[in-house]
Amino acid sequence: VSFLQNFPKKAKEGKLEEINHCVCCLQGCFGEAMKGNFTCLVNPRCTREFEHDLLKADNTKNVMIIGAGPGGLMAARTAAQRGHNVTVYDKDTHFGEVFRSAAYPMGKGELSTVISAYRKQCEVLGVTFKMGKEVSEEARPDTIVVATGSVPLTPPIEGINSENVVTAEDVLYGKIDVNQGPVVVCGGGETAEFIAQTNHDVTILEMKPAILTDMVVTNMIPTMERLHQQQIKIVTNATVSKINENAVSYKNADGDEIAIPASTVVSAFGYKAYNPLENVAKENCNEVYVIGSAVKAGNALTAIQDGYQAGLKL
């Protein structure tokens, strides 16, 4: 009932960022429903409204959240809703630095509203933000939530640090010009699609037998169709072995080494957990939670669910 009352009320008052908008990702609804666990990426309380009542905490705590990504912001919002004093720290000046890039591929622009909505909702609840600030041992919170996320994975490949090797984020943020010459994308089907809008010589090298295996099937099918329409070359069972200034070498399923031209190589091998602060946090605080990709590199759905659960435990 409160949802039906608050939705039009907030819209009428122009508080659009305080409304949980569907971002058409299909990850929590269709994707999780196929596994028997219907939920929502944006709203982790979905289908659990009566199970999780967001009751006020018995004791008000000073809570430090390290990381202003989707998981950290959800932990902050949930903790603040329960009456805690919450401060979010992030060494970057941008909110959700890694997650921001997810909104750049075709058809995913609405994902950008997730961070802005969480930020606004946190501000309304009185959450304090200290952006561009690294945490200090001088701060003595009652509870710390480590939500430092993940960083791009860089495999030990010969030539991986060459000047012509760039990250998917560099491409998506427009920091690198990839409009000329053959481009090889190591992983990252959506990044290849993004590049193919202006460059028609794009090849994907994928180590697995198929690409886009982590994508919800209802998103994967149209994405595959667009990749074929753009005539992007896709090579699977390809293990990259060497990179130089004008080519990429890979081994196929038979162990044969093959070289293909590449003026630019996009490193989109995935991510690894980034968690340099857990031990320090535990040395200075008795109640510490590590959530999302700081535990294991994953997706926003997992990070947001983790953040919500952490907020409930405080």
Q: Which residues does each predicted region cover?
A:
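Local beta-strand N-terminus motif with an aromatic residue
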Residues: 122, 141-142, 262-263
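Short, hinge-like loop/turn segments at secondary-structure boundaries
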Residues: 13-17, 104-108, 163, 220-223, ...
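Flavin-dependent oxidoreductase catalytic cores
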Residues: 1-66, 70, 75-81, 85-86, ...
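Repeat-solenoid scaffold signature
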Residues: 1-13, 118-132
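Rossmann-like dinucleotide-binding cores of NAD(P)H-dependent redox enzymes
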Residues: 88-128, 191-238
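Rossmann-like dinucleotide/flavin-binding elements
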Residues: 60-91, 95, 130-138, 147-157, ...
